Amino acid sequence: MAKEDVIEVEGTVTEALPNTQFRVELDNGHNVLAHISGKMRMNYIRILPGDRVKVELSPYDLSRGRITYRYRS
């Protein structure tokens, strides 16, 4: 999947799930299942419920995504 194909949206983490996966409610009201990107994992960036995050969605499966950025609160 090329970088140009992703859809970037913002949302709020509502639930932390096992295996570094999170339930994220997007600004448009949809809920997606998202995992942490590799660079966030390498730099030990912690994500908690209530955090604002940027999520990349694939155009092929809009119910799953990758968390690429956690906004400062």
Swiss-Prot record:
The keyword RNA-binding applies. It holds the Pfam family eIF-1a. SMART domains: S1 (SM00316). PROSITE patterns: S1_IF1_TYPE. Keywords: Cytoplasm, Initiation factor, Protein biosynthesis, RNA-binding, rRNA-binding. It is found in: Cytoplasm. Its main location: cytoplasm. Residues 1-72 form the S1-like domain. GO terms for molecular function: ribosome binding; rRNA binding; translation initiation factor activity. CDD domains: S1_IF1. Belongs to the IF-1 family. One of the essential components for the initiation of protein synthesis. Stabilizes the binding of IF-2 and IF-3 on the 30S subunit to which N-formylmethionyl-tRNA(fMet) subsequently binds. Helps modulate mRNA selection, yielding the 30S pre-initiation complex (PIC). Upon addition of the 50S ribosomal subunit IF-1, IF-2 and IF-3 are released leaving the mature 70S translation initiation complex. PANTHER family: TRANSLATION INITIATION FACTOR IF-1, CHLOROPLASTIC (PTHR33370:SF1). Component of the 30S ribosomal translation pre-initiation complex which assembles on the 30S ribosome in the order IF-2 and IF-3, IF-1 and N-formylmethionyl-tRNA(fMet); mRNA recruitment can occur at any time during PIC assembly. NCBIfam families: infA. HAMAP family: IF_1. This is Translation initiation factor IF-1. It comes from Rubrobacter xylanophilus (strain DSM 9941 / JCM 11954 / NBRC 16129 / PRD-1).
